[in-house]
Amino acid sequence: MSEVSNEAARRRTFAIISHPDAGKTTLTEKLLLFGGAIQMAGSVKGRKAARHATSDWMALEKERGISVTSSVMQFPYEGKIVNLLDTPGHADFGEDTYRVLTAVDSALMVIDVAKGVEERTIKLMEVCRLRDTPIMTFINKLDREGKNPIDLLDEVETVLGIQCAPVTWPIGMGQRLKGVVHLISGEVHLYEQGRNFTRQDSTIFPSLDAPGLVEKIGEQMLAELREELELVQGASNPFDLDAYRAGQQTPVFFGSGVNNFGVQPLLDFFVEHAPPPQTRETTGRRVEPTEAKLSGFVFKIQANMDPQHRDRVAFMRVCSGKFTAGMKTLHVRSGKDVKLANALTFMASDREIAAEAWPGDVIGIHNHGTISIGDTFTEGESLSFTGIPNFAPELFRRARLRDPLKLKQLQKGLAQLSEEGATQFFRPLMSNDLILGAVGVLQFDVVAYRLKDEYGVDAIFEPVSVTTARWVHCDNPKKLEEFREKNAGNLGIDAAGELVYLAPTRVNLQLAQERAPDVRFSATREHAHVKAVD
């Protein structure tokens, strides 16, 4: 086996997806804690204290207590290297989360035991479906009263359309919580309350028949449990590795992240069964992770990760080959050779200079405005990774300055923020308006906050008569020009120089589509096909 094959086989790159408040950031912390990456988990509840959760590091996030930007954390575990990509927890950040899901090989879905499958989880699941991403499920907050576990499995199967294979099963919940049974190994992990923030090893009995177990959980509960397990094992699916890796079955675990409970069995199972880096599609061919030459794509751009150094960092997922510090690569979109010096690896906000990286790893490349989302880097081959779309925004605002002299800073700020995916930015052909598009209202708050904080620009966002946007393409240049002339009042250019139809109403969009049958109106735009613009 080559060194690349060896290292790729050790990698497990995944993201955690959930509805806001299902306990995702807490679980992220606990995985890092069990992985030995942090000594003390900064519980999200302790916000007011100095101990902020390690993965929420932007000032706005610390103020609001939600993860707005996705961060990347790497830790070794049981001979494997785990790359955990945290995703924004707030409902408005669908697009950023979507892009993170393009960079992972599997996902972990967190569900609140009391609330079950929620709206945001359904949306994220749809995104995972597009790529058949393998998914494990952690049903969290078992220390509180919640829905019946059998009903929860049924809900996941019905609402999300994926088969459930329970791997651990709860012994009671809320006040009566006694532990979980591992359905594959037969072990019983006891629940011992204690919100200590250091690694906690629970008491484990080898089986339900082990001496001493009945004293711990009581005869009645043990009898109820045996009955329930018979029912569960008769009615549910046994774990099937191929079905899981094909995205058709989800192994299910129960636990309480805040109490460090049930996390260890999940992590052990994850590193053993989750897929290593997979084959990736490009515009020209399929790229295997074990290829000797480096290739990778940018799935996120983050401005000002370091307030001391007003910098921007492009997050690149390595897809094949080996990255070494200072190596020369081809930036495919611009056709220029770029030396990747001082690339970073991440442990949330702590950065270290990366000496090397392998398939599945994520590195940070310093970006001075030349790198965009979806850009591909190779060792010379001209190919572009596909499947990293921009979604048509659902909300629009016009940016207006309180101080008209700051126009240049506003344009620069909006261009940079749209490049990193915080918002989308459109310029109508027939006016000097600057129109922002977003998937949710909070995005506008974040942009306003960052414009003020990072660019010194005080901007107001006003309503604008745009309901939806579609990217327009036509194979016949003459017909496109005709369409452009007739519809100039509703057309604009996005930050990448692409033509966009800004529809004032859904009816208007429908009419425009009927009147121009040769023009394609798309609700998404592939990043891989973006032209370079100044």
From Swiss-Prot:
Keywords: Cytoplasm, GTP-binding, Nucleotide-binding, Protein biosynthesis. Its main location: cytoplasm. One of its GO terms (molecular function) is GTP binding. Residues 9-278 form the tr-type G domain. Gene3D superfamilies: P-loop containing nucleotide triphosphate hydrolases, Peptide chain release factor 3, domain III. One of its GO terms (cellular component) is cytosol. InterPro entries: EF-G-like_DII, EFG_III/V, G_TR_CS, P-loop_NTPase, PrfC, RF3_C, RF3_dom_3_sf, RF3_GTP-bd. GTP binds at residues 18-25, 86-90, 140-143. One of its GO terms (biological process) is regulation of translational termination. It is found in: Cytoplasm. Belongs to the TRAFAC class translation factor GTPase superfamily. Classic translation factor GTPase family. PrfC subfamily. PANTHER family: PEPTIDE CHAIN RELEASE FACTOR RF3. Increases the formation of ribosomal termination complexes and stimulates activities of RF-1 and RF-2. It binds guanine nucleotides and has strong preference for UGA stop codons. It may interact directly with the ribosome. The stimulation of RF-1 and RF-2 is significantly reduced by GTP and GDP, but not by GMP. This is Peptide chain release factor 3. It comes from Xanthomonas axonopodis pv. citri (strain 306).
